[in-house]
């Protein structure tokens, strides 16, 4: 009986950065891409925010349904930030076991837990943006109040100072094409 050859485990590329840094735009630009001959998987996020609320294309859940999914083990990763619950489905573990590269929209504050869970399979990538540009992007999308925007900028300053120089960093103040090339080069390198 022949033994099936197991593929190398894929890498989990953990994209993080402040609201308004352009993570969702980068994720969309990477959809359908191949990296090192493998299809790049983009993991959907489950969020306790109504669908169509601007910005990120996500799967909307009520807090009660989110809790049930946590209790059922439906999330590979989950966290709270900015008054919402966020989750990444367990399908990412299947994709990684198949050897596929997987790109997720993660959380800076949840990074340590993600590193503990995925170890060397996780590649943190920080997306940075000038704080004035971040503020303008948040105003333009019209989802947050001024107070919420101020709180997000303050959180960005705290977390960016702590994380920016520890990981691969994309400065997303220029063209989308340039930032996407940076991201795909980081992924291709691993």
Language model features: what each stretch is:
Residues 16-18:
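P-loop (Walker A) phosphate-binding loop of NTP-binding proteins
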Residues 32-42:
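Post-Walker A helix-loop "phosphate-sensing" segment adjacent to the P-loop in P-loop NTPases
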Residues 24:
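Walker A/P-loop
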Residues 103-107, 118-141:
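Conserved phosphate-donor/acceptor-positioning beta-strand/loop module used by diverse small-molecule
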Residues 143-189:
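Small-molecule kinase domains that catalyze NTP-dependent phosphoryl transfer to phosphate-bearing small molecules
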């Amino acid at each position: 009986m022949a033994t099936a050859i197991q593929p190398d485990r894929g890498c989990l590329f953990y994209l993080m950065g402040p609201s308004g840094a352009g993570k969702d735009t980068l994720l969309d630009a990477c959809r359908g891409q191949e990296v090192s001959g493998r299809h790049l998987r983009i993991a959907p996020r489950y969020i306790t925010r109504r669908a169509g609320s601007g910005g990120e294309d996500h799967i909307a859940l009520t807090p009660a349904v989110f809790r049930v999914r946590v209790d059922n083990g439906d999330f590979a990763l989950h966290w709270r930030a900015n008054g919402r619950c966020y989750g990444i489905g367990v399908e990412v573990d299947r994709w990684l076991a198949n050897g596929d590269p997987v790109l997720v929209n993660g959380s800076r504050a949840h990074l340590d837990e993600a590193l503990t869970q995925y170890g060397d399979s996780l590649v943190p990538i920080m997306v940075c943006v000038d704080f004035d540009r971040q503020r303008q992007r948040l105003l333009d999308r019209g989802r947050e109040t001024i107070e919420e925007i101020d709180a997000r900028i303050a959180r960005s300053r705290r977390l960016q100072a702590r994380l920016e120089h520890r990981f691969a960093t994309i400065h997303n103040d220029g063209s989308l094409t340039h930032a996407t090339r940076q991201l795909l080069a980081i992924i291709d390198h691993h």
